[in-house]
Amino acid sequence: PAEVPADLQLPAGFREPRICLPGVLAVCGPQAAAAGGEADETMERFCQIGCVSEALNHFPLVVVVDDSDFTARTLNNFLWVVFTRSDPAADVYGVDSFTQQKHWGCRGSLVIDARIKPHHAPPLSEDPQVTQRVDALAARGGPLAKYL
């Protein structure tokens, strides 16, 4: 789907569904609380609701994020959020998931938990003074100018 279905129902605490790409849905979820590597009950509940939500399962990929507007705004944002905030060994879920002959699968949407987790490092923020000093080094006539 290229737009959010009118009949899409989300569990309590999940909101603001946004289309990232055709077939890819970003949904804001509640703040992540599970420790690194542990299953998150919130995500399990999301997938259980997905078992009965036909509208959700029209999306092959659903990502649960902290800010769905930011995630869906550009492809770069989507790639950054999903692949820096998820661990394939711990943050991949599926609607109506199963294991058959040691192979995991799901009959509904593949769901990736790409929220900021308690064990993640805090976000980097620019220091204006450091930025100013680096800009001066790269300015015309500066020691780094010939490389830029």
Give the positions of each predicted feature.
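Charged, compositionally biased interaction regions
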Residues: 1-148
